[in-house]
């Protein structure tokens, strides 16, 4: 509400944003930025990203997953559930595959939760179609994963 949302509005001055996606850990980014963006762009779709293996926001049961920082296993008090319009669930494997792909193809060293955000944003962009602007936040840096299986390449 105080930092990320206003910064996005400033950076996108004069442009339309059709969807904003953020992973839900504490819910702070989605709630705060989502509020600011809904005020500026009344038709924007705000999308929560949660682990497929722990779909608590969707009404499912909590479970173990690999999307560090997302899916605490409960709905945090800091999450304004009225802000988001939809939820995209992302699996462990596709989040990791996406992180690896953007590292190899785009030079973006992203962590697992960032891989989840990128995957969800691509899904939403395909759904909305050509000419729409989809924005997400990459919450994790891949540097902390360099010694893990995420960035252990065989090829």
UniProtKB/Swiss-Prot annotation:
Residues that bind pyridoxal 5'-phosphate: 25-29, 113
InterPro entries recorded: Cys_Synth/Cystath_Beta-Synth (IPR050214), TrpB-like_PALP (IPR001926), TrpB-like_PALP_sf (IPR036052)
Chain ranges passing through the membrane: none
Key words of the record: Amino-acid biosynthesis, Cysteine biosynthesis, Pyridoxal phosphate, Transferase
Metabolic or biological pathway, per its Swiss-Prot or TrEMBL entry: Amino-acid biosynthesis; L-cysteine biosynthesis; L-cysteine from L-serine: step 2/2
One Gene Ontology molecular-function label: cysteine synthase activity
Catalytic activity: O-acetyl-L-serine + hydrogen sulfide = L-cysteine + acetate
A Pfam short name: PALP
EC number: 2.5.1.47
SUPFAM superfamilies given in the database record: Tryptophan synthase beta subunit-like PLP-dependent enzymes (SSF53686)
The protein's required cofactors: pyridoxal 5'-phosphate
Subunit description: Homodimer.
Family according to the record: Belongs to the cysteine synthase/cystathionine beta-synthase family.
This protein's name: Cysteine synthase
Organism: Staphylococcus haemolyticus
């Amino acid at each position: 509400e105080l930092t990320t949302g206003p910064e996005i509005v400033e950076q996108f001055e004069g442009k339309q944003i059709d969807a904003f996606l953020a992973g839900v850990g504490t819910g702070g980014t989605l709630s705060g930025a989502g509020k600011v963006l809904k005020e500026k762009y009344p038709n924007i779709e705000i999308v929560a990203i949660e682990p497929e293996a722990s779909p608590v926001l969707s009404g499912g049961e909590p479970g173990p997953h690999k999307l560090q920082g997302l899916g605490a296993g409960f709905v945090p008090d800091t999450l304004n559930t009225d802000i988001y319009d939809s939820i995209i669930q992302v699996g462990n494997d596709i989040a990791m595959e996406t992180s690896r792909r953007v590292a190899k193809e785009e030079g973006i060293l992203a962590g697992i939760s960032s891989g989840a955000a990128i995957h969800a944003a691509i899904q939403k962009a395909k759904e909305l179609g050509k000419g729409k602007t989809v924005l997400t936040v990459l919450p994790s840096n891949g540097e902390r994963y360099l010694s893990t299986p995420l960035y252990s390449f065989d090829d």
